């Protein structure tokens, strides 16, 4: 399904001296053919991404992709590698779930000789986690791969290709959540506001429409810096300030970064309270929202503490809502009868790696029964998706989004 023409790729790479017009004339028909077969979409955008670019070097790192705390074998760069490795080792995010190891190798092998290539899979199920690593022999081939394949559209996914960075405490947890932004602020203006504090890896402004970037801003955005210290300076400088065009001060804080002490206290309080009640997915919306916020903080300790979730829950004899063998399962309620899996992909894809989606259908009509499930690889990304999409208006319906629990609707 994902077979890429080596002949075409070779032609693309040999045309570095060609003009933009010659490039488009030579390659657009083939790309359009791929689009007609469903292999690619937006061929003009792909060609644009295939044209030579100037990269930011090893620090143009990944963001919003699966973090190194996934249940998978880390790459050499994640466990600490040499400076030479940093120029040949790439991480590739947002791969289609049904892409195979062979297709992954074929795609990146068309650029140059590969030393190693790994599509990361769940150790239990063998299912792709939607990302992988490629290590080239020649640093120039790694740079070409970024220039050529970053932004390539495969099925419903736009893959992200960038240098893998060595694991270091200085670069972890540098993602910021920003709210109260002017509805007219663009992504470029958001970056301009924060760029004075350090190198920005990625940025995003949430919009109301799930079908594309044409919707109105929700006044909420995310900024990921290269280093945590830069993010800390941005919080000090901008939290509570009024940027140009803002009617009220903005809030700038780390995206889901609780302390271990607070997390353990909240977890104990939630699970050991004799008066604890679990509101259902359809009632007591405000109460459930507060409970979800506490749960989000409590379970976040998995990433930020060596204490595992299983060891914490053993203290109180409870299971973690939403946690499965393949990731974090999210319950989505109040979908319209015409909703299908593509709606869930579009909703949750921007927040991180999605393992799978499922819309529950009526056996007789094959229409959506009003709810579905999304499994995401990374806890932080799942929690951020819930925080952003719970209460989101989709058409004439307001979605209710939470981690799946034992009391959630069964299919």
Swiss-Prot record:
One of its GO terms (biological process) is mRNA processing. GO terms for molecular function: RNA binding. It is found in: Cytoplasm; Perikaryon; Cell projection, Axon; Cell projection, Dendrite. The keyword Cytoplasm applies. Its main location: cytoplasm. Keywords: Cell projection, Cytoplasm, mRNA processing, mRNA splicing, Repeat, RNA-binding. Pfam families: RRM_1. Expressed in motor neurons. Residues 50-89 are annotated as: Disordered. Residues 88-166, 174-257, 328-406 form the RRM domain. Disruption phenotype: Reduced overall movement, decreased initiation of swim and turn movements and decreased mean body curvature change per swim half-cycle and mean number of swim half-cycles per swim. At 2 and 4 dpf, decreased axonal branches and at 4 dpf, decreased dendrites in motor neurons. Defects on motor neuron extensions persist at 26 dph. Decreased GAP43 mRNA levels. One of its GO terms (cellular component) is axon. RNA-binding protein that is involved in the post-transcriptional regulation of mRNAs. Plays a role in the regulation of mRNA stability, alternative splicing and translation. Binds to AU-rich element (ARE) sequences in the 3' untranslated region (3'UTR) of target mRNAs. Mainly plays a role in neuron-specific RNA processing. Required for the maturation of motor neuron axonal branches and dendrites. Belongs to the RRM elav family. PANTHER family: EUKARYOTIC TRANSLATION INITIATION FACTOR 3 SUBUNIT G. Interacts with smn1. This is ELAV-like protein 4. It comes from Danio rerio. The gene is elavl4.
């Amino acid at each position: 399904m994902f077979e890429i023409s080596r002949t075409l790729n070779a032609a693309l790479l040999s045309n570095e001296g060609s003009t933009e017009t010659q490039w488009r004339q030579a390659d657009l028909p083939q790309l359009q053919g791929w689009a007609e077969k469903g292999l690619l979409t937006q061929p003009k955008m792909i060609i644009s991404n295939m044209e030579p670019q100037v990269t930011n070097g090893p620090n143009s790192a990944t963001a919003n992709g699966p973090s190194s705390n996934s249940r998978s074998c880390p790459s050499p760069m994640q466990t600490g590698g040499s400076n030479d490795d940093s120029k040949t080792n790439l991480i590739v995010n947002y791969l289609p779930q049904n892409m195979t190891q062979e297709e992954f190798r074929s795609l990146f092998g068309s650029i140059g000789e590969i030393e190693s290539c790994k599509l990361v899979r769940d150790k239990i199920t063998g299912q792709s986690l939607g990302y992988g690593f490629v290590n080239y022999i020649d640093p120039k081939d790694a740079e070409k791969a970024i220039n050529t394949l970053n932004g390539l559209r495969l099925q419903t996914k736009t893959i992200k290709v960038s240098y893998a960075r060595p694991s270091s405490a200085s670069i972890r947890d540098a993602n910021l959540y920003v709210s109260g932004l002017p509805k007219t602020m663009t992504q470029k203006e958001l970056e301009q506001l924060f760029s004075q504090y350090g190198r920005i890896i990625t940025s995003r402004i949430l919009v109301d429409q799930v079908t594309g970037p044409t919707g109105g801003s929700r006044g909420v955005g995310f900024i990921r810096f290269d280093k945590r210290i830069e993010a800390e300076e941005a919080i000090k400088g901008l939290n509570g300030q009024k940027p140009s065009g803002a009617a009220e001060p903005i809030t700038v804080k780390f995206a889901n970064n609780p302390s271990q002490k607070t997390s353990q206290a909240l977890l104990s309080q939630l699970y050991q309270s004799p008066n604890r009640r679990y509101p259902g997915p359809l009632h007591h919306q405000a109460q459930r929202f507060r409970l979800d916020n506490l749960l989000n903080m409590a379970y976040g300790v998995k990433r930020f503490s060596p204490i595992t979730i299983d060891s914490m829950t053993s203290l109180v004899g409870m299971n973690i809502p939403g946690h499965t063998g393949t990731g974090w399962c999210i319950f989505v309620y109040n979908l319209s009868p015409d909703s299908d899996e593509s709606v869930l992909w579009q909703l949750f894809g921007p927040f991180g790696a999605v393992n799978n989606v499922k819309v529950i259908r009526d056996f007789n009509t094959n229409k959506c029964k009003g709810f579905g499930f999304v499994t995401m690889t990374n806890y932080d990304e799942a929690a951020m998706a819930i925080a952003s999409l719970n209460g989101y208006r989709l058409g004439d319906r307001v979605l209710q989004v939470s981690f799946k629990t034992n009391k959630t609707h069964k299919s």
